[in-house]
């Protein structure tokens, strides 16, 4: 029984990559009728859709509340219980995203502020409500806990639906609204993470009524969503997760788990002309300020020189380690001693540094300024901590320059070297280390690298359109695998033509075969064993996804 469950959980994780072969897709979404389902809080009515490729009918239940609206005095607090409803809730339209400020040019979204504070809702897409044994994929996607793109206009569930998998998307609070902390029990922080936990609890209690198995829940996180999933696996909420996929993100990245959380809250207050050193007064006044004003001022609330002194990027608000022993996240993941005995797929794209290098791809001459102000971003929590007031700090920078940059020189021709460096320090080092940590904690870890390129590589193609040079832009950019596992409506013109990509023959090869009933612990892929990741002598442990899919 345990072995069978583990194998099924792994199957859920790798179904995503089976979808690499669907490239001829025509948009067809039809509202036909509705379905009413009982939940722990009341009845909900969804609507019927049809999928892209096979016209498979499925139900969508959109905008189901899982917590009380986080308004007024609840603005920065952990999520509270939602009141039950008596009438049938019409769950037929998606709710707005959580309030955020979009600066990402790559997604084609409207720049600036959008979203609302009343945003704690989830969406469920199911092939049917007739039986409660389908695997469940819960999708989390945010970028650095500042922006979120997990609505159907961004990523649709069709490909999973056609594999008879239930898909759930969760909206959680972002920026200061989700991660302001006063470092006390009044506002301990991590409200956005606690939103996810609240939603997962609701899913655990109710997904059986939507055709899903509450014991087959896979958390699929991309970028900041992967960080959130990673963090939750190191908390008491891990029992809500039966398997996990971490795409291009872990909590070990130098971008996350910032210090000085309360100081940041007071700096935000000063930006909003709230001058006080009293936490209760600060909270009271912040609750009176408009959400728009908070969002526009929070970027200025990072401590001065924080970037240089702490080897971290300047994200004003994000997840924190809580001081309260009863909090959600009370230890750094690397200090956790808990066993995490579930299947985990973890990996990255081949050129994670592309998006972070966009400024230099558009203005290569600006690279010369790096000679004077080198971005020293080695993850300090992985024993790479250096004091900028000591010679060792500058000696380390010199060693890095010698290792990454040809002849130790950074010029406008160094863009390829810079992309490699940024990808390593912000993503690859921390992902490799986290894979090692999970391996040591008894988890069954499957490691992959996505290196495929076609018209479906949305981020890479947008980067190329904005770049003035192509040097160093080989491979796949961060997030490029998403449009191979989810329907991307904005690429429908690309999806409705034959793309030069993995052929139908590859479709027949991409099959994971499980030896039911035997004692093997590994996966058979392309007639070769995809071994668990391990620290030393790891042979056939990495799945390479490109034109010639292979294991090495």
Predicted feature descriptions by range:
Residues 1-25:
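Classical eukaryotic N-terminal signal peptides for Sec-dependent ER targeting/secretion
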Residues 26-193, 214, 493-509, 513-520, ...:
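Non-catalytic accessory segments of hydrolases
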Residues 188-207:
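Alpha/beta-hydrolase active-site loop
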Residues 212-222:
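Alpha/beta-hydrolase fold nucleophile elbow
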Residues 226-237:
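Short glycine-enriched nucleophile-adjacent loop
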């Amino acid at each position: 029984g345990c072995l069978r469950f583990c194998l099924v959980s792994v199957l859920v994780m790798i179904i995503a990559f089976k979808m690499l072969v669907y490239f001829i897709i025509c948009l067809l979404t039809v509202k036909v009728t509705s379905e009413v389902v009982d939940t722990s809080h009341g009845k909900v009515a969804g609507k019927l859709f049809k999928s892209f490729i096979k016209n498979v009918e499925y139900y969508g239940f959109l905008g189901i509340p899982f917590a009380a609206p986080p308004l007024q005095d609840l603005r920065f607090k952990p999520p509270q219980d939602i009141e039950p409803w008596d009438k049938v809730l019409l769950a037929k339209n998606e709710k707005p995203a959580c309030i955020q400020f979009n600066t990402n040019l790559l997604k084609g979204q409207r720049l600036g502020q959008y979203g609302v504070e009343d945003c704690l809702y989830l969406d469920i897409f199911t092939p049917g409500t007739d039986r409660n044994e389908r695997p469940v994929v819960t999708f989390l996607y945010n970028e650095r806990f500042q922006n979120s793109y997990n609505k159907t206009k961004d990523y649709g569930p069709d490909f999973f639906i056609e594999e008879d998998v239930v898909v759930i998307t969760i909206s959680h609070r972002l920026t200061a609204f989700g991660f302001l902390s006063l470092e006390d029990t009044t506002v301990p922080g991590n409200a956005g993470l606690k939103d996810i936990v609240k939603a997962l609890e609701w899913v655990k209690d109710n997904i059986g009524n939507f055709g899903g198995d509450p014991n087959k829940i896979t958390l699929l996180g991309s970028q900041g969503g992967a960080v959130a999933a990673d963090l939750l696996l190191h908390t008491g909420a891990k029992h809500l997760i039966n398997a996990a996929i971490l795409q291009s993100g872990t909590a070990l990245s130098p971008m996350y788990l910032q210090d000085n959380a309360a100081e940041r809250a007071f700096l935000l207050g000063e930006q909003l002309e709230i001058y006080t050193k009293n936490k209760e007064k600060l909270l009271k006044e912040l609750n009176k300020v408009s959400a728009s004003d908070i969002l526009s001022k929070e970027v200025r609330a990072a401590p001065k020189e924080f970037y240089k002194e702490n080897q971290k990027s300047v994200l004003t608000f994000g997840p924190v380690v809580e001081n309260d022993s009863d909090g959600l996240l009370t230890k750094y993941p690397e200090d956790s001693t808990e066993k995490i005995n579930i299947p985990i797929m973890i990996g990255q794209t081949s050129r994670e540094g592309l998006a972070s290098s966009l400024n230099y791809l558009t203005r290569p001459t600006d690279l010369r300024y790096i000679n004077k102000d080198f971005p020293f971003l080695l993850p300090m929590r992985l024993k790479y901590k250096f004091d900028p007031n000591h010679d060792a700090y500058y000696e380390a920078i010199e060693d890095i320059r010698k290792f990454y940059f040809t002849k130790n020189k950074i010029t406008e021709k160094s863009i390829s070297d810079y992309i490699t460096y940024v990808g390593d320090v912000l993503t690859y080092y921390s992902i490799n280390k986290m894979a090692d940590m999970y391996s040591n904690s008894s988890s069954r870890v499957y490691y992959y690298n996505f290196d495929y390129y076609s018209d479906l590589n949305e981020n890479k193609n947008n980067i190329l359109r904005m770049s003035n040079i192509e040097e160093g832009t080989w491979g796949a950019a961060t997030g490029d695998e998403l449009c191979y596992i989810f329907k991307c409506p904005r690429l429908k013109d690309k999806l409705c033509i034959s793309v030069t990509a993995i052929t139908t023959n590859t479709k027949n090869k991409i099959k994971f075969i499980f030896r039911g009933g035997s004692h093997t612990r590994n996966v058979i892929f392309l007639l070769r064993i995809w071994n668990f990741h391990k620290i030393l002598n790891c042979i056939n442990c990495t799945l390479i996804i490109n034109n010639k899919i292979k294991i090495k």
